[in-house]
Design a protein with these regions (language model features):
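Bacterial N-terminal signal peptides that target proteins for export
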Residues: 1-7
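C-terminal motif of bacterial Sec signal peptides marking the signal peptidase cleavage site
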Residues: 15-18
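Beta-propeller domains with acidic blade repeats across secreted/periplasmic ectodomains
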Residues: 21-243
Length: 243
């Protein structure tokens, strides 16, 4: 089905018009054995209020159970997805963002993107790895460890080799303990399925002997709507030799 840009835009405007409807019944009135219910209405798109994404305020912290303590280690991270603690105590933070490789071809896709964008938190991720290092005074240093990645997710260290699972491949880099930035250009260990990429994250786990890597590859669809051919090596855990 081909849709003109005018038709898609008009559908989006009409649908988003429903997002401006505000609830006139308080939450308290909607609770209990005899709640107040609004009259039934038909909408092109149900009314909704998309909450705005906000960060922690100054000195604001999550609440933890009694006996536990929580401290801020780092801020300003761009879509952090995975953590890996290195043998020397450094912590790697994988910052990623979806590859956005699927073309918008239906009103549903366009509307979904516009609604999600109302949260204000849809900015691009760092596509990098940040290194956090604890110091003697209890603070943490923050360094850009590796950048220029392609929607990274999984990361593993085997000996002095760092493996990073991008959305389309596994890269390996020479690592020296204690360094705060990878200088090695890296090389590709294995390619991974990455089209169209509905489920793009690639989790990574090393075998105990370090000879194998296991990478989780998500399916390319929810109900094989793109056909079985594009599901080859997807919805699977792939085994990769490190040698």
């Amino acid at each position: 089905m081909k849709l003109s840009s005018t038709a898609i835009a008009l559908s989006a405007v009409l649908a988003l018009a429903g997002c401006d409807n505000s609830a006139v019944i308080s939450p308290e009135q909607q609770m209990g054995p005899d709640p107040v219910l609004p009259a039934a209405q038909n909408f092109l798109m149900p009314p909704m209020q998309v909450p705005k994404g906000v960060g922690w305020q100054q000195n604001q912290m999550p609440k933890v159970a009694e006996g536990l303590k929580i401290d801020k280690v780092a801020d300003g991270l761009l879509h952090p997805r995975q953590l890996l603690t290195l043998p020397n105590g450094d912590v790697l933070v994988v910052e990623a963002n979806g590859p956005g490789t699927e073309a918008v071809s239906t009103p549903k896709q366009l509307i979904a993107g516009l609604v999600k964008g109302q949260s204000g938190k849809g900015g691009k991720g760092g596509n990098r790895i940040t290194l956090l290092r604890p110091t003697a005074d209890g603070s943490w240093e923050k360094h850009v460890f590796l950048e220029g990645l392609d929607s990274p997710f999984g990361v593993q260290l085997i000996g002095n080799t760092l493996y990073v699972a991008n959305t389309g491949n596994i890269m390996q880099y020479a690592y020296q303990p204690g360094e705060t930035r990878i200088s090695d250009a890296g090389k590709e260990l294995a390619d991974l399925p990455d089209t169209i990429n509905h489920h793009w994250t690639k989790a990574l786990l090393a075998s105990p002997d370090g000879k194998k890597l296991y990478v989780g590859v998500g399916s390319n669809s929810n109900i094989t709507e793109n056909g079985l051919a594009v599901e080859y090596r997807r919805a699977a855990v792939l085994e990769v030799d490190t040698a």
